[in-house]
Regions:
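Nuclease catalytic cores
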Residues: 1-24, 32
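Short phosphate-binding/catalytic loops that engage adenosine nucleotides
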Residues: 31-32, 100
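A structural signal for short, well-ordered beta-strand segments and their strand-loop junctions
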Residues: 35-37, 72, 103-106
């Protein structure tokens, strides 16, 4: 499993797609799940990636079309604690303004446990200061610990 210590190219490589495979398996009978994010983009786009605004870098991984409607799905893999970078959180809030429900498919890779979290729930708890916070040692990126 790729971690925050790996660069973008490592994180999106085929060998690190455990979370995406679990997400696709979870939603396969719940509607049409369409790949939307950067993982399947042509390699030419990667060279421009650093110049993009954060809201585009943090686009959701999938769009789900089901009988209940359309939703954005972001898949996040983790071990022990789900850490949501604050910059991703801010970008997801922008995507959330499209009036399309936004969900995080959180996958605990070692335990093979999945949880679906509505972004609105995360926003409410973050605004109330209910999440512990931290920062990665390698790059200083701040995050919320989502429980």
């Amino acid at each position: 499993m790729a971690t925050h210590r790996d660069n973008f190219y490592e994180r999106v490589s085929q060998k690190n797609q455990v979370t995406e495979m679990a997400c696709e398996e979870h939603f396969k009978n719940k509607g049409y799940l369409h790949r939307f994010g950067w993982d399947k983009m042509p390699s030419q786009v990667y060279s421009m990636f650093k110049r993009l605004p954060q809201s585009l870098k943090s686009m959701p991984d999938y769009i789900l079309h089901s009988k209940k409607g359309t939703s954005f799905i972001e898949s996040k893999g983790y071990a022990n604690q789900l850490k949501l970078k604050k910059r991703d959180y801010e970008a997801y809030k922008i995507w959330n303004k499209f009036e399309i429900p936004f969900y995080i498919f959180a996958y605990d890779c070692p335990k093979k446990k999945e949880t679906i979290i509505n972004l609105n729930t995360i926003i409410e708890k973050a605004e109330l200061g209910l999440y512990e916070e931290g920062a990665y040692e390698n790059d200083g990126n701040e995050y919320y610990i989502i429980k």
